[in-house]
């Protein structure tokens, strides 16, 4: 059923009026009702609520979205995640989600929700859990080192991140990697008033224990220049101390040892002390360490694990080489002193280099923990969380690069959702009216173009000249773009320029562009890393151990263009999904909707054009062959055989759905469907059909496996008892079921078993257990592959809990199978069993299904061969006292009684029934047949085939077989048919296994097949049905498909009671026909015995009662 919203419309394609005002009003109405998600087709719009909304992200709500179609539940990030996850396997195509929006719109939180959902719905194996833990725990770690408080966002990502998660063939994550883009390392040395440095600095100072603070010589944030300049140390609602503990936990998850963690924190502290190092010029105008910062330099050297003099030299001097390097050339090297300005530049360059390389090292360790598989054919889900569009009072090189990246992402959105969609309609010959939209490619070219040179190319050219500076760069821009529509130069005296971005006009200050683009780090600073005894720092500077690269170093602008180009290539290889984030106000306040700010975002995000195209266009398109192969199962004309073409097959499928021609259009190579509901209906129908066919296969193989399993148990028990013990009449022919207490639905019993590990329950039954005074006590017996449980039902002593559960299960005894020395039974037809143990008292109990219990115990016993003794005088070591222990041995005597019925236990004597069958009575067991192998031809349609589907052959014979009733049968429901022994029934259908459709005197109904004997020379069953055995044995053995055997027993010439050849099969509470493993299929398509262990559409029962297939 489709979900209906009470707050506006869920999908803005359904708006009655298509205008920006209508979009704004709908978003405002939903925001006021705490409904922050809205669709435009398959694009999710997310408005940051700046507060926690109750139950929106609860575990229960997350699981609600699993396997649901988009229209069934309210819009949500979980719905996008589920669509990605399912589409990945349905289409065999990697997926990605592009999360965009300006800073503070909620992109990082949306990315975390996608990862949270994928982790929750995938598998739980050891290796899978490891990968999921790394995926989830990498978030707080990367946020600590890569996020910061800005004026617009308390948790602003100051780097770009693209996380790729690899999946194996069953949908579980098996690896992944994180690619990071352009960390804003300038934030390490400078922050605007009211902003903070990266979170990790404050977390370390606040959350480190006293020992770590002492080791790292930490102080309060206001004592460090790199933190105090902005005047902001805390964030409302953020616990830096608690988040530091999360960071430490995340470090352990990704595999960082305690010593490596300490090395990381040591380097973070070193950067803080580096910022406290000050300089002044001496008489020669040379930089020298300020006396007041000598202590800071000492602390920096201590934390860097090097000497003070090396640090001072690296900061105050710059090594210059002259001459041409070569074997015969003379090279002169000079240590030139810098002035204080140059020293400050070197200090900040070193701080930025140390931090950015530490961040890259952490990302590398995350990737090592994820274990990305190179050259793998695995499908992937990519999650892009990158810095949002930024406009500040003063915008520099970093803001231009960030906004350039957002321009490229907007271009991808335009290319894939607006431009490409309209071009596809034209190329496929679909009638379409062109819709205009703003294409920001002109702005992207302005920044990145090579020919003619764009802004970044010009900046690189200026950096190549020794005398290139910011003013030269600005002059080149004015010269090149004076007439460009998206570039505007300021007044002649100003050092700024303006770019007209898709999100608005941004004025950039050219000051610092050249230096930041060069991104230089002098060799003196690199060589300082070679002097340290730290194990971490040399890993951050691999150039220490490499030969000097004579090539010119790449610029920051070149690197970002290269990395964004690679990102676009990776995104283009995936099926994209979109989350467009909107910030409702600039004050980070809940319940505050700034109409003008939101309208600005609605316009520059192009939501109106997106609505128009989605409304006028088609929600779904697919090539004919892929559509046909996916949905052919939905139509009886195309399944299982179709010899027509793909296009005609697709049209046949759609006609079977009663679709009107206007609801879809046929292109040259693709089918286009207008309404998403049509596709949802197709998917639902396909799921039902596939489920039905899969269950038919599962039922067949499960039936065969169960028959093999129970045959081995029956044979084991029969071989043991043959000639050793009299048999009860109902025991000899009773089919086995395994579970007689509905264990698979009893979660309290399951909880008791779970306490001892992952045990597989193989047999359950209610038994009579006898204590040391021969008193009978009712118990539940559970036999697992490891132990035997005896569980009592007692009154609940907890007064509060008693209202809900007046009775509870209490484990009284657990016998390990390895501790059982032998099993003792009498030679008579009773149901008593004695379990003898090594060091504990013996256990005596009575079980109505002791034969099945014994056969299952033989199969489960792994410690050699189980000893089974038969004797009418059995010694039982009784319990010494209430505290336990092995007491005296008591002899129990078994005597045959004079009446049929149940056994009677009094004192030390057991009186058994008088009507037991002889000990040589054995069941008539036939081993299951081998699984049949059938070759089925595969029909592959040709694109232009004109021949019709082939005829499947003539109809089967209409002559119905007859069967003779061997026993009386009384119907218990209107669907069943009663009959008497000797009646002749017409068998209408044998396809349901143990329950056949039959007719008697004009009445029709279900009848148990093992109450009947097919009459010889009767018509055969339907084509492909099971063979009918012949013979005059009474009762007969019938073989069902899969090798199921059913029948009576062969007890020799003197065992048949007068008047009847054999007793009727157990029809109440047994395994077949009314409770067997081969029973009428349930409504879910599984094998559903009445009161048995029926799997719900699966291969094995949930309780673990059946063997694993």
Curated annotation (Swiss-Prot):
Q: Which SUPFAM superfamilies match?
A: P-loop containing nucleoside triphosphate hydrolases, SH3-domain
Question: Could you tell me where the Low complexity compositional bias lies?
Answer: 1030-1043
> Origin organism of this chain?
Dictyostelium discoideum (Social amoeba)
Task: List the keywords (alphabetical).
Answer: Actin-binding, ATP-binding, Cell projection, Chemotaxis, Cytoplasm, Motor protein, Myosin, Nucleotide-binding, Phagocytosis, SH3 domain
Q: Might you name a Gene Ontology BP term for this protein?
A: chemotaxis to cAMP
> Which Pfam families does this UniProt record tie to the protein?
Myosin_head, Myosin_TH1, SH3_1
SH3 domain span:
958-1017
- Show the segment(s) annotated as Actin-binding: 564-586
Using the UniProt annotation, give all residue ranges assigned to the region (Disordered).
1017-1109
Protein name (Swiss-Prot/TrEMBL): Myosin ID heavy chain
Q: Where is the TH1 domain?
A: 725-919
How does this chain assemble? Answer: Myosin I heavy chain is single-headed. Dimer of a heavy and a light chain. Inability to self-assemble into filaments.
> What task does this protein carry out?
Myosin is a protein that binds to actin and has ATPase activity that is activated by actin. Myosin id may have a role in chemotaxis and aggregation; it could serve to stabilize and even retract cortical structures, such as pseudopods and lamellopods. Involved in the process of phagocytosis.
């Amino acid at each position: 059923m489709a979900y209906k919203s009470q707050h506006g419309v869920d999908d803005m394609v359904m708006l009655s009026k298509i205008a920006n005002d209508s979009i704004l009003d709908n978003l405002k109405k939903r925001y006021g009702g705490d409904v922050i998600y809205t669709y435009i087709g398959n694009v999710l719009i997310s408005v940051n609520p700046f507060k926690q909304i109750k139950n929106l992200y609860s575990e229960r709500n997350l699981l609600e979205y699993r396997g649901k179609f988009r229209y069934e539940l309210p819009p949500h990030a979980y719905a996008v995640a589920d669509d990605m996850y399912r589409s990945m396997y349905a289409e065999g195509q990697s997926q990605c989600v592009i999360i965009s929006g300006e800073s503070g719109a909620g992109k990082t939180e949306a990315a975390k929700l996608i990862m949270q959902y994928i982790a929750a719905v995938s598998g739980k194996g050891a290796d899978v859990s490891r990968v999921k833990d790394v995926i989830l725990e990498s978030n707080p770690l990367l946020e600590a080192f890569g996020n910061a408080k800005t004026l617009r966002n308390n948790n602003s990502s100051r780097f770009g991140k693209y996380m790729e998660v690899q999946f194996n063939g069953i949908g579980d994550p098996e690896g992944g990697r994180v690619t990071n883009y352009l960390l804003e390392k300038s934030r390490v040395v400078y922050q605007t008033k009211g902003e903070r440095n990266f979170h990790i600095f404050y977390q370390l100072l606040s959350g480190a224990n006293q020992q770590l603070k002492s080791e790292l010589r930490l102080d309060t944030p206001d004592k460090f220049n790199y933190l105090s300049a902005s005047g902001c140390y805390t964030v409302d609602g953020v616990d830096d101390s608690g988040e530091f503990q999360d960071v430490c936990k995340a470090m352990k998850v990704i595999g960082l040892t305690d010593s490596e963690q300490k090395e990381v924190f040591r380097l973070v502290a070193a950067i803080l002390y580096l910022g406290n190092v000050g300089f002044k010029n001496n008489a020669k105008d040379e930089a020298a360490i300020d006396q007041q910062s000598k202590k800071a330099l000492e602390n920096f050297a201590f934390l860097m694990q090097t000497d003070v003099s090396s640090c001072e030299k690296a900061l105050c001097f710059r090594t210059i080489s002259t001459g041409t390097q070569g074997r015969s050339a003379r090279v002169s090297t000079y240590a030139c002193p810098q002035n204080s300005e140059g020293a400050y530049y070197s200090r900040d360059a070193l701080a930025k280099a140390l931090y950015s390389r530490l961040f890259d090292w952490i990302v590398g360790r995350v990737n090592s923990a994820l274990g990305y598989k190179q050259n793998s054919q695995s499908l992937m889900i990519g999650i892009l969380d990158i810095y949002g569009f930024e406009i500040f009072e003063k915008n520099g090189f970093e803001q231009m690069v960030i906004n350039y990246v957002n321009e490229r992402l907007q271009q991808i959105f335009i290319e894939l959702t607006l431009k490409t969609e309209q071009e596809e309609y034209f190329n496929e010959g679909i009638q379409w009216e062109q819709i205009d939209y703003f294409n920001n490619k002109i702005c992207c070219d302005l920044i990145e173009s090579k020919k003619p040179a764009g802004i970044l190319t010009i900046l690189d050219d200026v950096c190549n000249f020794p005398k290139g500076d910011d003013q030269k760069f600005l002059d080149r821009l004015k010269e090149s773009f004076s007439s460009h529509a998206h570039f505007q130069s300021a007044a002649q005296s100003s050092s700024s320029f303006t770019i007209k971005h898709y999100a608005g006009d941004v004025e950039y200050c050219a000051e610092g562009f050249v230096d930041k683009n060069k991104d230089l780090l002098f060799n003196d600073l690199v060589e300082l890393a070679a002097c340290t005894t730290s194990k971490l720092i040399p890993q951050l500077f691999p150039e220490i151990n490499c030969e000097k690269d004579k090539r010119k170093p790449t610029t920051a602008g070149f690197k970002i263009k290269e990395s964004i180009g690679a990102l676009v290539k990776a995104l283009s290889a995936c099926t994209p999904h979109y989350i467009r984030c909107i910030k409702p106000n600039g004050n980070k306040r809940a319940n505050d909707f700034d109409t003008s700010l939101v309208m600005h975002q609605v316009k520059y995000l192009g939501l109106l054009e997106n609505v128009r195209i989605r409304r006028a266009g088609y929600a779904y398109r697919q090539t004919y062959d892929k559509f046909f192969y996916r949905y052919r199962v939905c139509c009886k004309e195309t399944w299982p055989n179709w010899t027509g073409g793909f296009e005609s097959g697709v049209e046949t499928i759609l006609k079977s759905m009663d679709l009107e021609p206007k609801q879809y259009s046929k292109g040259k190579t693709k089918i286009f469907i207008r309404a998403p509901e049509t596709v949802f209906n197709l998917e639902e129908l396909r799921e039902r059909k596939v489920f039905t066919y899969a269950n038919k296969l599962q039922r067949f193989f499960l039936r065969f496996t169960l028959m093999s399993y129970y045959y081995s148990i029956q044979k084991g028990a029969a071989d043991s008892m043959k000639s050793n013990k009299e048999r009860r009449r109902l025991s000899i022919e009773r089919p086995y079921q395994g579970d007689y207490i509905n264990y698979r639905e009893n979660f309290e019993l399951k909880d008791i078993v779970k306490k001892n590990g992952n045990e597989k329950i193989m047999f359950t039954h209610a038994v009579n257990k006898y204590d040391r005074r021969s008193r009978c006590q009712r118990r539940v017996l559970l036999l697992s592959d490891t132990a035997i449980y005896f569980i009592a039902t007692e009154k609940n002593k907890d007064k509060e809990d008693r209202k809900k559960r007046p009775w509870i299960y209490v484990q009284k005894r657990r016998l390990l199978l390895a501790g059982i020395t032998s099993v003792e039974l009498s030679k008579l037809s009773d149901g008593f069993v004695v379990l003898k143990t090594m060091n504990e008292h013996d256990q005596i109990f009575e079980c109505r299904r002791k034969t099945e219990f014994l056969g299952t115990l033989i199969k489960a016993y792994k410690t050699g061969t189980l000893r089974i003794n038969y004797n009418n005088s059995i010694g039982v070591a009784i319990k010494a006292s209430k505290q336990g222990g092995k007491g005296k041995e008591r002899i129990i005597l078994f005597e045959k009684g004079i009446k049929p019925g149940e056994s009677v236990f009094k004192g030390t004597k057991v009186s058994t029934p008088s009507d037991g069958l002889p000990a040589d009575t054995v069941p008539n067991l036939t081993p299951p047949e081998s699984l049949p192998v059938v070759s089925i031809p595969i029909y592959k349609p040709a694109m232009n085939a004109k021949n019709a589907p082939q005829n499947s052959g003539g109809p089967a014979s209409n002559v119905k077989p007859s069967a003779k009733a061997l026993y009386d049968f009384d119907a218990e429901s209107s669907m069943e048919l009663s009959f008497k022994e000797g009646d002749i029934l017409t068998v209408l259908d044998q396809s349901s296994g143990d329950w056949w459709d039959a007719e008697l005197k004009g009445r029709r109904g279900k009848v148990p097949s093992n109450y009947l004997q097919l009459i010889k020379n009767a018509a055969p069953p339907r084509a492909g049905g099971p063979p009918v055995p012949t013979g005059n044995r009474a009762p007969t053995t019938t073989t069902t498909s899969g090798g199921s055997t059913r029948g009576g027993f062969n007890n020799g010439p003197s065992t048949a009671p007068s008047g009847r050849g054999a007793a009727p099969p157990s029809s109440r509470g047994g395994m077949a026909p009314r409770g067997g493993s081969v029973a009428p299929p349930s409504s879910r398509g599984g094998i559903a015995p009445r009161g048995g262990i029926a799997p719900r559409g699966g291969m094995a029962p949930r309780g673990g009662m059946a063997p694993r297939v």
